[in-house]
Amino acid sequence: MRFYTDYLTFNTEKHREYINITPEVESALRKSAIREGMILVSAMHITAGVWVNDAESGLLADIDAWLEKLAPFREDYRHHRTGETNGDSHLKSLLVHHEVIVPVTNSKLDFGPWQQVYYAEFDGQRPKRVIIKVMGE
């Protein structure tokens, strides 16, 4: 089995943002030259997440509204006693998880017809990283 590692580094423009990173994941897969296996995509920050879903703007707005309903910003989070003000960002990241694993078949991401990889930022406007680890033959 072979392994290939790549990192994405970017600055998000907004405090909360959803970025389709599928092209970058596909680029890492091409660089790896791995034909069969799996690819791990993981946010390297505790207030961010990675998910697989449809790249449709209405759905992204629905996801954002759902996350805000389940984990709204509040002054009274215990985490804020540490001097931080991002308790809701931590909770939102728990809801979407921080990583995904995608099968690789014939040197391609083995997705359904609408699936895309998204990076979800909940405490942005500063440098962030994502690790991409390709494993296989």
Model regions and ranges:
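Active-site histidine-anchored catalytic micro-motif
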Residues: 1-137
